[in-house]
């Protein structure tokens, strides 16, 4: 399929599902994958990944991306998943029912269930409709920005089902009166290289304006779904941004790693008297400034380009103090072997942030790395408080928004940790 992706802009979309159905029929395989003795406990407890070193034998022929049947060492059927020998995650499970066909009806059920869940849990005007493993569609992300969809395929098997799923997404949303006017593919994550797949950024179907205005928590943003980070916007912090509104009225606020100005603008709309947003990216600062103007907050919320690690010591040396400091850094680690260095980074930035908070003010701090787990992140914050000679009173602890559900049997689905603390000087 990858050979045709670069040509998809403006193509006729009307036969997409029929073509994809044909591909899906070829996607099924009679291949049986048998696991080693003692392996398979993760799958039996609800996990979705089988690694290359867990497999004993493969019987039958297949192509990468095909659906195969998985047995445990004793020959007990464990379900079906798609296989890719280019990936260390050799099989991603699609169903634990060995007799269940992974066809269009199956995919429609998965998409429908994902959408019904969002309707019951979040504001769906802009939200993550499909969150990979947590929606039992491993390797697939689908974000809705008003009437635009952005899809991302991170696994080969899902890549081969992509066009069917896009068609089903449109159908399911249309049942609720939502007409999708455009779909853009943002399959440009590094994970694709591990799957042996090329980077893809392109329209699926007719071209459209890729700058989309959304409204979240009463704040307007212009989202660039083509060139913005991830799929264009960080939807996972939606309700964490709302949470900081309660502590920002009439306050002086510093928002670090502001990106598009999301936390800063939530502070501004809540009635903060002065908000400063910092980000190392000139492009991000430009976007944030435009968003401030869009919301009529340009006189209250200001942004400038700066390296936060360099700027915070300068602010401390200048005697600056803030009622609220917000720390929303990028992931300092994306692998287990870099956790120690990441902990140093989180510790340093939290020390710097705490020192800028007025006595009795507030610190909002978070980590978006799965590998920086709750225990390590909490430990780092405590160490930072000791080093900064501050006492912390926890206001609340939060995770990612409910449209990024945490599947307890898939620990990789839990990644965002978000705290609000009151910061008190040692006395």
List PLM regions with ranges.
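Rossmann-like S-adenosyl-L-methionine
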Residues: 202, 206-427
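Short Gly/Ser/Thr- and charged-rich N-terminal loops/segments
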Residues: 2-10, 21-23
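Non-catalytic substrate-recognition/targeting regions of SAM-dependent transferases
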Residues: 132-143, 162-233
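A short, charged
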Residues: 105, 109, 113-117, 121, ...
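Non-catalytic accessory regions of SAM-dependent methyltransferases
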Residues: 15-146
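Short histidine-centered catalytic/ligand-binding loop motif
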Residues: 92-101, 150-162
């Amino acid at each position: 399929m990858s050979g045709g992706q670069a040509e998809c802009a403006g193509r006729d979309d009307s036969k997409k599902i029929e073509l994809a159905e044909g591909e899906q029929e070829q996607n099924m395989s009679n291949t049986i994958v048998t696991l080693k003795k003692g392996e398979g406990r993760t799958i039996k407890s609800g996990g979705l990944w089988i690694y290359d070193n867990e497999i004993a034998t493969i019987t039958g022929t297949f192509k990468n991306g095909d659906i195969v049947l998985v047995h445990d060492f004793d020959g007990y059927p464990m379900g079906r998943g798609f296989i890719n020998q280019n990936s260390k995650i050799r099989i991603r499970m699609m169903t634990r029912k060995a007799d269940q066909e992974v066809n269009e009806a199956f995919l429609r059920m998965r998409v429908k269930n994902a959408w019904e869940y969002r309707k019951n849990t979040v504001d769906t005007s802009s939200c993550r409709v499909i969150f990979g493993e947590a929606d039992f569609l491993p390797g697939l992300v689908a974000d809705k920005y008003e009437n635009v969809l952005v899809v991302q395929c991170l696994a080969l098997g899902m890549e081969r089902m992509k066009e069917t799923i896009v068609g089903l997404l449109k159908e399911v949303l249309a049942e609720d009166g939502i007409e999708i006017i455009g779909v853009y593919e943002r399959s440009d994550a590094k994970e694709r290289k591990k799957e042996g797949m090329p980077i893809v950024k392109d329209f699926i179907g007719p071209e459209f304006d890729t700058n989309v205005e959304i409204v979240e928590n009463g704040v307007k943003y212009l989202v660039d779904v083509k060139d913005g980070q991830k799929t264009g916007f960080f939807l996972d912090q939606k309700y964490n941004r709302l949470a900081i509104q309660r502590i920002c009225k009439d306050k002086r606020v510093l928002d670090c790693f502001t990106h598009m100005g999301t936390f800063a603008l939530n502070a501004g709309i809540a009635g903060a008297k002065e908000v400063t947003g910092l980000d190392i990216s000139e492009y991000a600062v430009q976007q944030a400034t435009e968003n401030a103007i869009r919301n009529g907050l340009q006189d209250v919320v200001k942004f400038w380009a700066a390296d936060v690690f360099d700027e915070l010591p300068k602010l401390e040396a200048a005697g600056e103090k803030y009622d609220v400091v917000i720390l929303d850094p990028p992931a300092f680690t994306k692998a287990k072997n870099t956790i120690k260095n990441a902990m140093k980074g989180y510790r340093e930035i939290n020390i710097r942030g705490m020192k800028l908070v007025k006595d009795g003010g507030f610190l909002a701090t978070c980590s978006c790395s799965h590998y920086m787990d709750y225990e390590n992140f909490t430990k780092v914050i405590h160490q930072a408080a000791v080093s900064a000679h501050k006492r912390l009173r926890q206001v609340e602890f939060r995770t990612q928004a409910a449209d990024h559900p945490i599947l307890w049997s898939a620990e990789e689905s839990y990644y965002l940790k978000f705290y609000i603390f009151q910061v008190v000087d040692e006395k």
